[in-house]
């Protein structure tokens, strides 16, 4: 996201708070949106129409959005049991406070971002698979030196992109600041 302009806009429009690399929107009690600097949005308690409006707004501030936009839908509910449980696509919480939801949002956002890395790697492998397969089958590569260099360059760029962004998967500062 274009994070600073997004925050400035949202701070004028609705209740928005910024904590390092996360914007938190709380339009109503028990309704949260967590917007991560790296382009992932986790919503809790939004109805379908409000979700669509927010996503449409966020796309205006997106930088190189994935095509198509990746969406995952999970259900959460309050549970009388202690702690947090995730089974299939159901998250059960004994506490649906903003802090608990934000901690889960960090995990879900990182999972979504990791899935996008996996998709990009899979596409690169599928696009270049013919090179080692042809080499193994025929002993030669049916590409010019220039074409082969381009393919190697694309693979290198993909690797560099992922390595440079892999720090997104570190333990979020939020969890160090709020260990409870």
Predicted feature residues:
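Short Lys/Arg-enriched alpha/beta "domain-start" segment
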Residues: 1-95
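Glycine-rich beta->alpha junctions and the first turn(s) of the following alpha-helix
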Residues: 102-115
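Membrane-associated alpha-helical segments
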Residues: 125-126, 132-180
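Short, charged/polar micro-motifs that form catalytic or ligand-binding hotspots
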Residues: 44, 107, 148, 152
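A short mid-domain helix/strand-loop element embedded in enzyme catalytic domains
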Residues: 84-100, 118-142
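Short, intrinsically disordered, mixed-charge
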Residues: 56-63, 119-126, 167
